[in-house]
């Protein structure tokens, strides 16, 4: 059973509405600026990358967009990944299973999709912490587009700080991601 290692407190919800990077509406422009490996968080973002001919090294999806089920064509495209890991991760949380799956996906030589039963909305934070410097993480910004986060020491520190300020067991999170 999954153990919740971080929970987003209500008072921090507004803070996470600000994008961590530049917003793109054109997938090709995003891909031209993205580092390698590329991690995608969200079904629609992953779908757009796949439609543009790019399979991210790791994708984290939950079968929903803005809490509604995604269209069948999106699910079908995502099912094309050769490697798949299924995890449970309740809304507004980060679980040990999600972190272990993210770490495993980044270590695999083949692109891997992590399918979340629950919600993946906070997964971009540990993805930035776990990805190597020089990589990129892309996630959806509802109603605006795709946010591209370049993984640097600074963006990792920013995401680490956000996770630490959540109701979290950061030492355990760090031990899984390192």
From Swiss-Prot:
Enzyme Commission number: 2.7.1.237
GO process terms (BP): coenzyme A biosynthetic process
Keywords: Coenzyme A biosynthesis, GTP-binding, Kinase, Nucleotide-binding, Transferase
Class of this enzyme: transferase
InterPro entries the record matches: GTP-dep_dephospho-CoA_kin
Pathway it works in: Cofactor biosynthesis; coenzyme A biosynthesis
Keyword GTP-binding in record: yes
MF GO annotations: GTP binding; kinase activity
Record has Nucleotide-binding as a keyword: yes
Catalysed reactions listed for this entry: 3'-dephospho-CoA + GTP = GDP + CoA + H(+)
Binding site for GTP: 43-45, 62, 64, 120
Highest taxon listed in the record's lineage: Archaea
Function: Catalyzes the GTP-dependent phosphorylation of the 3'-hydroxyl group of dephosphocoenzyme A to form coenzyme A (CoA).
Family per similarity comment: Belongs to the GTP-dependent DPCK family.
UniProt xrefs under PANTHER family: GTP-DEPENDENT DEPHOSPHO-COA KINASE (PTHR40732:SF1), UPF0218 PROTEIN TK1697 (PTHR40732)
HAMAP family: Dephospho_CoA_kinase_GTP_dep
Protein name: GTP-dependent dephospho-CoA kinase
């Amino acid at each position: 059973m999954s153990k919740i290692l971080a929970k987003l407190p209500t008072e921090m919800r507004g803070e996470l509405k600000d994008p961590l990077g530049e917003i793109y509406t054109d997938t090709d422009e995003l891909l031209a600026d993205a580092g390698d490996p590329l991690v995608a968080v969200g079904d629609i973002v992953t779908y757009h990358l796949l439609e543009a001919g790019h399979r991210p090294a790791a994708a984290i999806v939950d079968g929903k967009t803005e809490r509604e089920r995604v269209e069948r064509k999106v699910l079908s495209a995502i099912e094309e990944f050769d490697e798949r890991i299924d995890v449970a991760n309740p809304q507004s949380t980060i679980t040990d299973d999600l972190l272990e799956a993210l770490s495993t996906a980044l270590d695999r030589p083949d692109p891997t999709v992590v399918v979340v039963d629950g919600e993946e909305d906070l997964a971009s934070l540990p993805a930035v912490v776990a990805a190597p410097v020089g990589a990129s993480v892309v996630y959806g910004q509802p109603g605006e587009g795709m946010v591209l986060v370049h993984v640097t020491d600074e963006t990792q520190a920013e995401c680490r700080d956000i996770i630490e300020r959540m109701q979290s067991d950061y030492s355990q999170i760090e031990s899984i991601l390192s």
